[in-house]
Amino acid sequence: MPVQTILEVSLSQFILKVLWLDSNVALAVDQVVGKGTSPLTSYFFWPRADAWEQLKTELEKKTWISEADRIALLNRATDIINYWQEEGRNRPLAEAQSRFPDITFVGTA
């Protein structure tokens, strides 16, 4: 299993994960547990569906997540979606990774 460097979204408890594809971008959130992570949400795809709204709804169901953490995660999700939509889908994954060093990119097609 490859070693992943996990960079924080200024949220030591959560990691925003991104699957970077040619025709979609997918977003998910993991919770940091000890030295590992546990999936908190499934992947939500943009533009196939409204990933941002689905992520927001899923995070709101988890009432133990603070509003500040929810907002921070959703703001970063907005940044990723906007970048992918405006220019990122035509750019290499490495460029997205360098632009968003606090996000965990988990793969491509």
Curated annotation (Swiss-Prot):
Disulfide bond positions = none
Question: GO CC terms on record?
Answer: ribonucleoprotein complex; ribosome
Keyword Cell membrane belongs to the record? no
The region annotated as signal peptide is: none
| Gene Ontology terms: biological process | translation
An MF annotation (GO) of this entry: structural constituent of ribosome
Q: Note the superkingdom of the native organism.
A: Bacteria
Q: Which InterPro entries match?
A: PSRP-3/Ycf65_sf (IPR038447), Ribosomal_PSRP3/Ycf65 (IPR006924)
Which keywords annotate this record?
Ribonucleoprotein, Ribosomal protein
Q: What does this protein do?
A: Probably a ribosomal protein or a ribosome-associated protein.
Q: Which family does it belong to?
A: Belongs to the chloroplast-specific ribosomal protein cS23 family.
Assembly notes = Part of the 30S ribosomal subunit.
User: Mind telling me what this protein is named?
Assistant: Probable small ribosomal subunit protein cS23
